Amino acid sequence: EPIPGFPEFGHIPFEGLHNTRDLGGMPAADGRRIAPAKLIRSGCLHKASEQDLARLVGDYDLAGVIDFRTQLERDKEPDPRELMEGVVFYDFPALSGETIGITHGAGVAQDLKTFASYNASPHELVRGMYPQILLDDAGRVAYTSFLEVLLEGDGGAYLWHCSEGKDRAGLG
C-alpha cells in the first residue's frame, strides 16, 4: 500500500541503475518527513550510465556514496569512482564474508555448495539473515559508520548501496 507523500515508494528511474529510491517524503519522527533528494538507496553503481552518474552528482548534489558490499564484490564490479568527481566514497562491508542469497562475489556454484552444507531448513536460513547482518560485528561497524557519515554530512545527498539495493541497503 502506498505511503501518503511518498509516491511509488520513492522510485527514481535511471538507465543503468536499478532499484534506486529517494527516501524524501517518507514519514519521520514527530510527524515530519525526510527531505527530498538527500537520502538515496540503490543497487550497485557498476552498470550506471554516464548520464545516470551525471544526474546523481549534479541534480542530487551527491556528496557521498556508502558501499555495503564485500571486498570481493567491489573487486568484481567496482563503483565508477573516476566518473564521480567530488564525491567521497566509503567502503563499509556489512558482512564479514559471503552470504548465500545476498552477496554476489563467489558465484552460483559456491552458493550451491554453501546452501548444501547448511544444516537447517531454507526457511531458517532466510529468517536468520537479517539479524545476522545487523548483529554481526561487520554489520554493527558498517551501519554505525554509515549513520555517523550521515550525521556529519555537509548538506549534500548521500547514496548507499549493496549489489541489488534490497537486503544490506534496505536495512540501511
Question: Locations of the language-model features?
Answer:
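Cys-dependent protein tyrosine phosphatase-like superfamily
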Residues: 1-159, 172
